[in-house]
């Protein structure tokens, strides 16, 4: 069923719902409040515990036509994916991609059948306990800018809009990576520019201004999801990412990336924020991205909301990070080593603090095939290291007081159809894409299905099935995880325990281990730490603890006075003697007291 957007401009929500009739039912008065909210620079739950969100994007399949620009063919496949993510990685969050092209196939017309499938598939993840962040996605503006024989493709804006724009024949010139189209393809640049400048187009439905139309479409999506997700499911919705990887397209005379972000992008987000409020999403933050090149380590343009002042709690600082030098294959020789990404992720923490808002890295990763794929194990390890702490492994034990907050993040990507696609690139039957992600030669999916339909990890489980502090009763002071993930057959160990802690050294031995230090707070609820499958769980802590029956969650007691510094060492080593464990605890207690 489809709705005409451009004829519906009511002054109040009740009028809108009356005009739309039964297609968008009234918002339920008893809808559950969000399970995760914003408090300063932290995500928190209803117990006041500091929450870390970790998971994956679902998925790059939305960029493809083969399954209707949805992450999954149906709810059954969504459940297969969600169960695999839970069981193989212990993740708690997904970033769920949305397609403008699929949602508005004709000017002013919303496809509620598509939105119904979105709600159903996202609801599967919510039912299994995942937090869900919806993402209004685009790359290179639209697939319809590209001719059937092009080397590249895009996703995002619908065909009718591109046709009305009358854009020039696309060409990237001498490009070795699809991302170069962003700044070198005149059609992509002009179309992107037109959106931000609200160009008025002549369409079959009359005159339509592009940015206004995007906002109207987005509001209809938000209204539909608010009305059609059950209260329990909606409670698991974190918020909205209004626009993936924003860029100006072209700058006006006298304009640069910083002024564009200040004068164009930020006002757009403020308008989107009001739209969320009017669509029943006032208690969810907008997860806003700065200009996409603000933190590039090769192509860099000033940004990161340098001129907005504090933006929390109604906004979250949402960014991506890809190691452009490592992906290039020529600007970084060899593999990543300890601390390669630490400064880049420290910069994200610094912007979070300056903006008084939490930070989340909603895309990161490295190609799993191709001529730089040999770097993936080390680069991805370095990125997770950067999420866990701002310090290198060599620095951590000696400078632990400056470890910084643990960052939330969703890796790109989780596509159960990896390597099993049948995508007609740019609708060309002679260019059927089957391998990898089936999109612009990318191959990032951490998961795939075998011939029996069972999901398996395409990366080392030690890297992806991680220890992380999912809910800390109080304030996290420091965290680190030595995953000892492998590059081929060789374990990468970047976190040596110092010789000044000999009993901790003996307890850890050559095993994987994590250390969490926190200052107590909250309402007495336990601190919850996610554990890898099959972990031996040798624990040295100053608080009582329990481990869940499935072995996947460590609960550290939240009882006692607030403001007390606590510690927990969690290792995969064979348990030492009681005396040795006590000696390790004494060392840790002295170390933590000296540091904090």
Feature map (PLM): residue ranges:
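Secretory targeting and sorting signals
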Residues: 2-28
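Signal peptide processing junction and immediate N-terminal pro/mature segment
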Residues: 22-28, 218, 287, 408, ...
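Active-site mouth of glycoside hydrolases
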Residues: 33, 38-39, 43-44, 50-53, ...
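Extracellular glycoside hydrolase catalytic/binding regions
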Residues: 35, 74, 202-405
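Extracellular/luminal ectodomains and secreted, surface-exposed scaffolds of diverse proteins
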Residues: 36, 542-552
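Short capping micro-motif at the N-terminus of alpha-helices
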Residues: 53-54, 547-550, 556
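Hydrophobic anchor at the start of a short beta-strand
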Residues: 132, 359, 409
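Aromatic-rich peripheral "rim/lid" segments of glycoside hydrolase catalytic domains that contact
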Residues: 306-311, 318, 371-543, 556-596
